[in-house]
């Protein structure tokens, strides 16, 4: 009888352990591991995902990694993107839905030489732009900043052409290109275009609509743990940095420290609505602004991409990880 009870107990424990097994969840970033992804690596390092019942795999993006396509093909559950790219994906039949964000504003900035004191001084300059600029912020900039007649050249992801020509303005990211300028012992003004009214969020968490419908609990757990990871990372990034450097062997302590300092300086994670709504918060008015921008610039067809249904607040609205 005792042996029989022992067998029942063992079976019960086995079933209990099986039911508690962590659920696999794959998250793909938009670049090599860096400080801008620190909160996710912090959540991984501190077992926040594990404690939430998830077995999270973080995959790095990169210059030739088409994360939206990979997510659509089932290679990732959620990705880092932005709400503009998510809307544009609907135009191509990919139902990608923002569920939260990392940055309360875009990380895109214009780097200028010291003679540019304000947006009015951009007139007559030549701009170095990456290819994706033409389907994202450049149509907005041409209209909002009166740059319709501006000369443009390809941005080759090197700061040398910019440093060599005082008439150039270069696109960049608040956390990246200014570091390269600093390392070259040069000077540049940094103008985040969000300060001039560019509405999209930066580094949003975007998931397939089908994933949200089939696995809402997993998405909710991932979002909540990630936001706590971001709060912890900005307080003490040590644990996350270990994983970042393990994944990206080219990443230095100096560059990580610069990225964190820039995120704090510009309140990229903690500013705006995050002050009261919590880290990662997204709101309908902000999302609507981006949708309207794309419609106005004929980058999406509102008949094919209606605003309703293109986003969800259900996972982030009640998380409220206050900075």
Where are these regions (language model features)?
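Hydrophobic helical h-region of N-terminal Sec-dependent signal peptides
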Residues: 7-15
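Bacterial N-terminal signal peptides that target proteins for export
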Residues: 1-7
